[in-house]
Amino acid sequence: MLAYALHLRAKPKCVLLFGLFVYLLADLSSAAEFRVGLVLDRGGKDDKSFNSSAYQGAMDAKQKLGVFVKYVEASDDNAFEPLIRSFAQKDFDLIIGIGFAQKEAIGKVARQFPKRQFAIIDAQIDEPNVRSLLFEEHEGAYLVGAIAALTSKTGKIGFVGGMDIPLIRRFAMGYEAGAKAINPQITVLANYAGVTSEAWNNPPKGKELALSQYDSGADIVFAAAGASGLGVFDAAEERKKFVIGVDANQDWMKPGLVLTSMLKRVDQAVFSIIEEARNGKFSGGVKRFGLANKGIDYSVDEFNAKILTESVRTRAESIKAEIVSGKIKVPDFYKKQ
């Protein structure tokens, strides 16, 4: 009887010890979890373009690789450094800056936290703990420019850029070169939403510029303008003209009016650097994404299959192959400066 009583009195302690063991094990598991901090640019995760693609890549990594992901959206350019620093101070394993505007902030914080791992999209930072993820946007722009010229009935097409900077000029130059390779007489109208970071998040301005181009005779407009591009899509719907999307596959947004999207696989870049870092294979340096490794491409799906004709697709595939082989040399604004 006494032994039984002692057993009953001892049981709660066993339960408590077991519970403590489980708690400590869970805590250790949480501490061992690979943590990713994602700093989005001004357009935010709902821009349906550049930032949305980056966010999707991180969410894919969360689901497929089991990493922890926390994302933040910058309210203005001054917010980048504090957000990046906060992730570094909280011992996040990998911190990713989305967009060239974060170059200075990522570089500064990376130097102050040399044991942390960083990555940045669209900028090159020469630090051993920073991976620079760069894209050959001019290749994709050339390709969709050719597609636009092959499709246009008016001999006039348009381009609406976001912030007037070398990166977007690179899109514009490639687009015009691709179009004129098909039709040397084609007219390419080009406008930009502004010269400050506000230009990425101004749909009304994007719509105004696109309407002006459509009303001037353009029957296709390529939008490379972040969230401002949403206004270009609205203009296309209003005028019943074609639009070309950018970064993410935007064909679904206005079915039957989106001729194609120039795919800039930011999602692929974000996923790949998270996977490398999680597997202990992170290194600094530069990784480039272009047509050759499918980091750049154009879209074909159920939303544009009927308007992107088979003959145009066949020609586009031929042009793509010639760019990859080097037979076609695409002009690069970065090298023209």
Task: Describe the function of each predicted region.
Residues 32-337:
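A residue-level marker of the well-folded mature domains of exported/periplasmic proteins
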Residues 1-10:
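N-terminal secretory signal peptides that target proteins for export/translocation
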Residues 13-27:
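Bacterial N-terminal signal peptides
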Residues 10-14, 321:
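Hydrophobic alpha-helical segments, especially transmembrane helices
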Residues 5, 15-17, 251:
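Short amphipathic alpha-helical "recognition" segments used for binding
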